[in-house]
Amino acid sequence: MTARAKVTLHHAPNTRSTGALLLLEELGVPYDLKLVNMKANEQRSAKYLAINPMGKVPAVVHNGALVTEQPAIFMYLADLYPEAGLAPAIGDALRGPYLRWMVFYGSCFEPALIDRAQKHAATPQSMSPYGDYDTMLKTLTDHLERGPYLLGSKFTAADVLWGTALTWTTSFKLVPELPVIQGYIARVNERPAMIRGRAKDADLKATLG
């Protein structure tokens, strides 16, 4: 086995793992796809739990190692294929901002959205990982105003992550459809690999019924 052995993506169409599928399309690399039928509750089967005990998708297996958690998968894959140019290299001035926005997604954005959607009682700001929803959202939108992408003119894997997340969350009204957000979503989703990947995901969903 080598560092460039083919990646296997365990994927359920039209879920969070769609983002990982889109990233692989952006990277333009061959990969193996293992479908997880969530309608049949396959994510809770003994077979799948042996792969990912959390019973969640996406999950990536490469060189015998398991990678889970959306930002970790994105960082792993983008670094695995540096020739695609979707991750600033260590030492690049953009590496820090890139990592910031990758981690901000899981540590601030998603927790804030879940708390808001579930109408959880507000945690004191000093104890909350994201402070408060309004501060989290303003931090994001102020940064997007600088555009066109999270790292300025450079499109990276972080934009695949955030473009996918914002497409979902605005469609479910969890995030307001502000012009700055809608413009960013449009720029990300108009890319050929994103269009191709979404069509592939729709076809995969259809095969599962």
Q: Residue ranges of each PLM-predicted region?
A:
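Short Asp/Glu-rich motifs
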Residues: 42-44, 188, 207-208
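GST-like fold's C-terminal all-alpha helical module
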Residues: 101-192
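Active-site-flanking alpha-helical
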Residues: 23, 78, 165-166, 198
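Terminal-tail/helix-coil boundary detector
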Residues: 197-209
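Conserved beta-strand edge residues that scaffold enzyme active sites
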Residues: 38-39, 158, 202
